[in-house]
């Protein structure tokens, strides 16, 4: 649901929950966050959802940005039903220690060697750590992990196969829009890999991507996708 006249350009107040058993055939459900949780206030945006599994609760949760009229945009989380069609718990703030008193959006969580790493869009791409999944996050430093100039948002992290190198991808929305990359081995120093097709990262058949994510595939999954989309070389 959106209302541009009341909430401005960033007025999407619903999220889409999608699921698939083969990454080819998908089902989706639209969930109206604002209508479901009026107790939070007048929600003006629900942005950039991601999903994570909570091993303690043995449940999936969605963490995403919520903006409330008269307030700041911050990261919240809410558990889903078993069918992954709706949120079933009131969204709570993804916990920083101490609590953050300014806007931070577009979270990405990864567990590496017993530490949870949270990257957010906060006047650049910032990096926080915690030993707990949903609380206790602290920024490691005020460093901007994005090394390409211009506006940045929507970080996502993955490990290169067979290495100790982690790639941080983010949306570099300066004109023209494109994904950009940093690389780290210690989560303290981040090396600039530049934008798609300006460095080692290549985009073969698309451009201008936004808010991307990367997941690992088995060979069987990759082969099935290549066959479905008629990809000769991948």
Per-range role (PLM):
Residues 1-234:
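Carbohydrate-active catalytic/glycan-binding domains of CAZyme proteins
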């Amino acid at each position: 649901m959106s209302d541009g006249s009341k909430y401005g350009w960033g007025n999407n107040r619903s999220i889409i929950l999608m699921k698939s058993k083969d990454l080819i055939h998908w089902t989706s459900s639209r969930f109206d966050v604002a209508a479901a949780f009026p107790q939070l206030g007048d929600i003006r945006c629900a942005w950039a959802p991601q999903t994570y599994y909570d091993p303690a609760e043995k449940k999936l949760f969605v963490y995403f940005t919520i903006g409330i009229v008269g307030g700041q945009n911050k990261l919240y989380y809410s558990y889903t039903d078993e069918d992954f069609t709706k949120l079933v718990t009131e969204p709570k703030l993804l916990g920083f220690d101490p609590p953050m008193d300014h806007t931070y959006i577009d979270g990405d969580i990864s567990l590496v060697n017993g530490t949870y790493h949270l990257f957010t869009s906060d006047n650049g791409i910032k990096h926080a750590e915690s030993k707990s999944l949903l609380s206790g996050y602290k920024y490691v430093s005020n460093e901007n992990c994005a090394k390409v100039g211009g506006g940045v948002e929507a970080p996502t992290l993955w490990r290169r196969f067979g290495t100790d190198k982690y790639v941080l991808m983010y949306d570099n929305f300066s004109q023209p829009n494109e994904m950009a990359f940093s690389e780290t081995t210690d989560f303290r120093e981040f090396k600039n890999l530049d934008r798609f097709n300006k460095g080692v990262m290549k985009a073969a058949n698309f451009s201008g991507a936004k808010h991307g994510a990367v997941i690992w595939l088995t060979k069987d999954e990759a082969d099935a996708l290549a066959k479905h989309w008629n990809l000769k070389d991948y």
